[in-house]
Amino acid sequence: MYARVKRVKRDSVENLYKQCQLGADCPPDVRNKVEGTTLADRLLQIFGSILYLGNLGIGTGKGSGGATGYTPLGTARVPASTPGTVIKPTRPFSVPLDPIGSGIPSQPVGGRLPVDIIDASASSIIPLQEVLPETTIIVGGDSGPGLGASEIDIVSEPRPDVVGVDTQPTVYTSIDNTVATLDITPATPPVKKIILDPISSGSEGAAAITFSDISAADLNVFVDPQGAGDRISFGEEIELGPINQPAQFEIEEPPRTSTPGEGFQRVTTRARELYNRFVQQQPTQNIDFLGRPSRAVQFEFENPAFFNDEVTMQFEQDLQEVAAAPDQDFADVRELGRARFSETSAGTIRVSRLGTKGTMKTRSGLTIGQKVHFYFDISDIPAAETIQLRTLGESSHDFSAVDNITESTYINLTETTNEGLIPDNILEDEFTENFNNAQLIFATIDEGESMIMPTIPPGVALKLFIPEIAASVLNVVHPSSEWTILIPNVPDEIIQPAMAVDVYDDFYLHPHLLRRRKRKRLDFF
């Protein structure tokens, strides 16, 4: 058994390349890596002539940034300082010299730095501008009403809160070992100018109220409701538009189903299945196609309790004993699918069923037939006929309806009119009552008529109320002894009902009313 040879690691690329320079064998990968002729280097050279990829750190070397590492952008590299002995240059007489720095104070000979003295009572807030006062120049035009040029004063107030300078002084040592300090004075700030416009908008003078020294603690605000303010505007007034205004859009056609995406896929799949060149299109107007399609295929009786329209119906029929179908369009139908509903281009509903006909049978018993698409278009419900009604009581002239109940009269008690009073004679009628050509009508019966009424013999106090026939009033009749009492005559003969005998007519008695007698026959039977 052979011992396994241990793999020895190859020397570094730098050492191998040095040996190549001395004449040793040089692997091609080492030479290409050191000389920069690898595939990646060539691609960088090719694309570098087209695209500029400088300062991106793209290369085949390490990603460590070298021995010194990466430097952040925008910062300068500060060399690390190593502790050591500082040797200062000397002059004759052994006078030590300090180098002059750029604004950074160095250590003086005495070992002490100049210190700025700060007053203990000064404010702890250091303002941006110090020592130098602000000079304010007020330029005004002609003096307006109530405001003259002599009332404007120029005030300059220094702020001596903090004593010091903004920059550090430069310190150097002289020959006699004395310290000289150079104060750097900051530049003078620009002069502020205030321009007063004396033009007034009205004829009334503007009253200016000045207050003395007012601090934030005792500030008072006076509000006068009777006073009116002036509107001050600078520049042109530009109307601002609404920001983030909601967008308005119109939907061309809203979805008609709750799932438009799935519905569209279903319609597409159904159209491909029912409407293609391999399916025969067969319209029908058979009413049984909507509810009981089996009655259109064959003569049979089906129990409605076991009928299911949601399944595919199959009809077993031998071709040798073919019977005629109730509907000629459904002849030789072997299979009929469930009902499918769709919408036509005219907006009506279409009921479709996919069927298969058994028109051919092979010797092996296989039945072959064409697929047929039976569909029934349900007609839409027409709109009801509208009949224009005519206006009742129409007239050829204009008229106006006046309702006195709905009319209103407004009386203003505070308003007084001087039209005068209306006299009473205006309210009286001017017509005189005249009875010329008048006719007096008595609502009584004629004298020639007589009425026969049964009465009681005289002597009995009885009052009768007889209604008048000619008018709808009541007349009171008092009985009197002078009246003639008419008593109706009683007939002597007894009144019997009249009987008429017609000798020119005859009648036939119904046969069941006659008694049956043996061996007796009537002449008219």
From Swiss-Prot:
Q: Which domain of life is it from?
A: Viruses
**UniProt cross-references to Pfam families, sorted A to Z:** Late_protein_L2
- UniProt GO molecular function: DNA binding; structural molecule activity
Q: Which UniProt keywords apply?
A: Capsid protein, Cytoplasmic inwards viral transport, Disulfide bond, DNA-binding, Host endosome, Host Golgi apparatus, Host nucleus, Host-virus interaction, Late protein, Microtubular inwards viral transport, Phosphoprotein, Viral penetration into host nucleus, Virion, Virus entry into host cell
Q: Which cysteines are joined by disulfide bonds?
A: 20-26
Q: What is its main location?
A: virion
UniProt entry tagged with the keyword Phosphoprotein: yes
Q: How is it modified after translation?
A: Highly phosphorylated.
Q: Where is this motif: Nuclear localization signal?
A: 2-11, 515-522
| Location(s), subcellular | Virion; Host nucleus; Host early endosome; Host Golgi apparatus
Q: Which GO terms describe its biological process?
A: microtubule-dependent intracellular transport of viral material towards nucleus; symbiont entry into host cell; viral penetration into host nucleus
Is Oxidoreductase among the key words of this record? no
Q: What HAMAP family does the record tag this protein with?
A: PPV_L2
- Please describe what this protein does: Minor protein of the capsid that localizes along the inner surface of the virion, within the central cavities beneath the L1 pentamers. Plays a role in capsid stabilization through interaction with the major capsid protein L1. Once the virion enters the host cell, L2 escorts the genomic DNA into the nucleus by promoting escape from the endosomal compartments and traffic through the host Golgi network.
- Return the similarity comment: Belongs to the papillomaviridae L2 protein family.
What does the record note on quaternary structure?
Answer: Interacts with major capsid protein L1. Interacts with E2; this interaction inhibits E2 transcriptional activity but not the DNA replication function E2. Interacts with host GADD45GIP1. Interacts with host HSPA8; this interaction is required for L2 nuclear translocation. Interacts with host importins KPNB2 and KPNB3. Forms a complex with importin alpha2-beta1 heterodimers via interaction with the importin alpha2 adapter. Interacts with host DYNLT1; this interaction is essential for virus intracellular transport during entry.
Task: Identify this protein by name.
Answer: Minor capsid protein L2
Which species?
Human papillomavirus type 60
